[in-house]
Structure formats: structure tokens, C-alpha cells
Design a protein with these regions (language model features):
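Intrinsically disordered, low-complexity repeat tracts enriched in Gly/Pro/Ser/Thr and acidic residues
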Residues: 1-384
């Protein structure tokens, strides 16, 4: 009955929590020709492009710890030592151990509520909460959740109404760090996230998901700055690859989609329309200082009506294409038609594709093996 108040020092706690699963990154491969992997280049080489943060942490304190503290104090006022109640003072106790094994060390006010600096250890959930208490609630401090091998997950920051509110930091035992804004227990506002592998995100989150403007720097040298929606690249942005390739334009669910410009590291470029990661619609491909193609595209190939010309427009050939092959007699609009007829126009698209393939000859074999996968940025900052 009651609590034991005879302890002179804070009892040692055996912090051993069962392992908590973190959701695996959802990797999906799209085989449909309508949703082609992104532009034969670098965005589709991302593997584990967003390390997962998972449905993790938070409920322990928000729904378990604080209510249990308040409940126990309300139900067991008789367990407090005689002489504790006073109308004018905050009383300091070295340690109070309750019959259920919970331990509190710190200040109390005259209403028998925790006040001032204090530590509370909850035995049944193996959690330690310490910091500044007011009227029985932790308002700023740290919450420790033990992991295997003497490691801890830690929250440090502001707490309001038993939930994380304001500025705070989550430090997970695997090395991942979230630092930024919380609102009613959710990650909401501006933040910086450092992943276990060194990937860094800085930007906005809304209700636990990437949404708004942000920057992502991957450990393999890729950089993105632009708009995020639902944990994915959505809207306008700039994506840079480690070999010097740059895409600037519109994204839809991580894919080049809409109007954009792709500049290769050798100076070649495509500017025009994309659909599901492939060149489709109107666009201009420029082979640096050699030739350009201006016309219709489908599935990354000339398809429809378009014009080939040299860099300075000294000759122009109007062609009808079907997936990279001439299907009608070309019209020689400008230049020496006799000489131009000696050009095998069907090899032009092949040269375009060779340029692209050369650019994807990345030394990292692991990256090569994934360059024809569509890796989706799936669950990242779920509500906890």
C-alpha cells in the first residue's frame, strides 16, 4: 500500500524495451509502358531514395506516459510522505517509489502535483521522462526509450497537453535525427532530417509527411530542390545528378511530367514535354554543336512530325517518324538535297539514345543494377 520513500538515491532502472519495428521503404517497380522509368537517366537510379522514418515514437509519451503519471498521482495521494503538503513551497524528494515500480524524483507542489525539475521512470513501459514539470505535466524535457545494446531513442523539446508541441528533436538509436516543429504531437512545420546513411532533408512537413518546399541531398551526390507532396517530388523543382546531369521542370510522383529541360553533362539537352518520366509531346533535342531535332516525341523517341537541322540551320529536313524510324519520304526544306539524301536519317535517334546510355554508364554496379527500376518515395514521416 502506498509508496516506499526510504530510498536515498534514485534506483537504477533496467531499460530494456522490446524491439520496435520500423516500416521498410516501399519499393515498387512499374512495368507499364505508360509509366516508364524516369528518362533513361539518373532519377531512376535512386535506391532507397528516401530512407524511411516510419510510424514511430510519440505515442509512448503522448498516450501512455503522461496520463499514467497523472492517474497514479490522483489515485494514490496517500502514498506521499507526511508533511509534503504545504501551501507555499515546492518540495524536493530524493526518490519516491510507488508500489507498481514507478519512480519519481523531483519537486512537488502543494496540490500534490509534480512541479519544477523532476524525473519519472515508468517501469511497465521502460521509459524515463525528465525535465521541467508544471501542475503535474512535463512541459519541457527529454523522454528516453531504451533499445537493445544499451542504446536509447530520445525526444528533447517542448511538451504541451501531454504531446510534443513547439520546437523539438528526435534522436533515434539508429542515428536518424528529426529536428524541427511539432504541433499537437505531429511533425508539422519546418524541419531538418538527417538519415542514418547521411541523406539530409531540409524543408516543410505537414501532418507527418513531406509537403511544401524542401531540399534533399542524397549520400550518392544527387540533389533536389523544389516542391514535395505526399513524400514525393511533385510540382516544380531542380534535380542534379553527381555526373553533372540536371533536370529542371515539373514532377509528378517522382517522375518528370509536364514541361521541363534535361541537360546532359556533355552539353546535350532536351527541352519540352514529358509524360510519366519519358519524352512525350513536343520537344527539342540539341546535340551540342552538331544537330537538333524539333518535333513530336513518344516513349523517348521521335514519333510524328519533326524537323532535323544542323546547329546553324544551314540545312533543314522535315520528317515523319514512327518510334525512331522514318515512315515517309523526307522533305528537304533547306540545303543541298542531293548531299542530304546520303544521310541515313534512321541512325539519328540511335545516336541520341547512345548519348543517353553513355551518360548512365555509372561506375557503381549496384546503381547500374537499379537504373531501370522506378523507386517510389513511399512512407516516410507517417503520423505516430
Amino acid at each position: 500500500m502506498g509508496c516506499q520513500v526510504c530510498r536515498q538515491t534514485e534506483p537504477e532502472a533496467n531499460f530494456l524495451l522490446p524491439d520496435r519495428d520500423i516500416k521498410n521503404l516501399d519499393i515498387q517497380t512499374q512495368n507499364s509502358s505508360e509509366k516508364k522509368e524516369v528518362s533513361n537517366n539518373f532519377i531512376n537510379t535512386f535506391e532507397n531514395v528516401l530512407p524511411t522514418f516510419g510510424n514511430y515514437f510519440g505515442s509512448d509519451f503522448n498516450t501512455l506516459i503522461s496520463p499514467k503519471i497523472q492517474e497514479y498521482m490522483t489515485e494514490h495521494p496517500q502514498s506521499l510522505p507526511e508533511g509534503l503538503i504545504d501551501n507555499t513551497h515546492i518540495y524536493e524528494m530524493k526518490a519516491v517509489e510507488f508500489t507498481n515500480g514507478n519512480v519519481y524524483k523531483g519537486g512537488w507542489n502543494s496540490d500534490i502535483k509534480m512541479e519544477g525539475q523532476g524525473k519519472y521512470y515508468l517501469k511497465d513501459v521502460n521509459v524515463l521522462a525528465e525535465g521541467v514539470w508544471k501542475e503535474g505535466n512535463l512541459i519541457y524535457g527529454r523522454v528516453f526509450i531504451s533499445k537493445e545494446n544499451d542504446l536509447f531513442d530520445i525526444y528533447e523539446g517542448k511538451i504541451r497537453f501531454s504531446t510534443f508541441n513547439g520546437k523539438g528533436k528526435l534522436i533515434l538509436s539508429n542515428g536518424m535525427i528529426y529536428e524541427g516543429d511539432f504541433e499537437d504531437g505531429e511533425k508539422n512545420g519546418n524541419c531538418k532530417i538527417i538519415f542514418e546513411d547521411g541523406t539530409i532533408y531540409e524543408g516543410q512537413v505537414e501532418k507527418g509527411v513531406l509537403k511544401g518546399d524542401g531540399k534533399m541531398n542524397w549520400k550518392n551526390g544527387y540533389e533536389y530542390e523544389g516542391s514535395f507532396q505526399n513524400n514525393k517530388l511533385n510540382g516544380r523543382g531542380v534535380l542534379k545528378g553527381p555526373t553533372g546531369d540536371i533536370y529542371e521542370g515539373e514532377f509528378l510522383n517522382n517522375l518528370f511530367n509536364g514541361n521541363g529541360k534535361y541537360t546532359y553533362s556533355n552539353g546535350n539537352s532536351y527541352e519540352g514535354q514529358f509524360l510519366y518520366g519519358a519524352k512525350k509531346g513536343k520537344g527539342i533535342y540539341k546535340c551540342n554543336n552538331v544537330f537538333e531535332y524539333d518535333g513530336d516525341w513518344d516513349n523517348d523517341l521521335p514519333c510524328g512530325i519533326g524537323k532535323l537541322s544542323d546547329w546553324e540551320k544551314n540545312w533543314i529536313i522535315k520528317c515523319s517518324w514512327r518510334y525512331g524510324k522514318i515512315v515517309e519520304e523526307p522533305i528537304y526544306e533547306k540545303g543541298d538535297s542531293d548531299n542530304l539524301k546520303n544521310i541515313d536519317l534512321n541512325i539519328i535517334p540511335e545516336k541520341m539514345n547512345l548519348n543517353i546510355r553513355d551518360l548512365t554508364n555509372i561506375e557503381n554496379t549496384e546503381t547500374q543494377s537499379t537504373q531501370y527500376k522506378l523507386v517510389t518515395m513511399a512512407s516516410f514521416l507517417d503520423d505516430y
